[in-house]
Amino acid sequence: MDTVRKTRETAFDELCIKTQGFLDQMMSLGVTSCEAKSGYGLDLETELKMLRVIRRMNDEHPMDICATFMPAHAVEEKWKGREDEYIRLCCEEMMPQVRRQGLADYVDIFTEDSVFNADQSRTYLEKARELGFKLRIHADEIEAIGGSVLAGQMKAVSAEHLIKIDEAGLGSLSEGGVTAMCLPATSFYLGADFAPVRRMIDEFQIPVATATDFNPGSCPSLNLQFVMN
């Protein structure tokens, strides 16, 4: 939660300067398009601030940036044991404001045993779809608790991580036409397993993409060339 605290404390203009530096580094490595997620605010004010930074950068920087709203990235201490209430807050207060202001095209959620369960994720994603957002989901990074199955059922654009995906999840992604967004640099830095990409392609004909997952907690690299290797 240290990053959440620092993001809340940092002024909009300073966040823009930091973000511009990251984008410049990415462009120097040949990247011309990227996705940027919120998720280090966990409250409406800071989530909106992050999305406005993304919009400013998309307007002013040569990088083509796709914005994803992800308030359901973690569970703050005050919401532990009250995750249903937090999901309701996301659905009833946060998402409608983001949609009205046109700050994001996508919504994402971290479906994991220690974060949000599959039922909570379904409620969240159904509301996002109702409001016109396209769907993404962080699934099966630590345990397979139904996130990838849900991604297929909801026909999400992508499901991220998928390190622990099971047979049911593989089948659901394939049937739902979901892109498996595999993040090998995160596995590298955490010393974790890699997603079963070969099975995804050969046995289930799942479209596979890769990305850096550049973030302060689990992947300090924004080098897509490193990821591809």
Give residue ranges: language-model regions.
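Alpha-helix C-cap/termination motif
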Residues: 29, 60, 100-101, 154, ...
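Metal-coordinating catalytic core of metallo-dependent amide/deamination hydrolases
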Residues: 3-20, 24-25, 32-145
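Active-site-adjacent C-terminal substructures of enzyme catalytic domains
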Residues: 134-135, 143-229
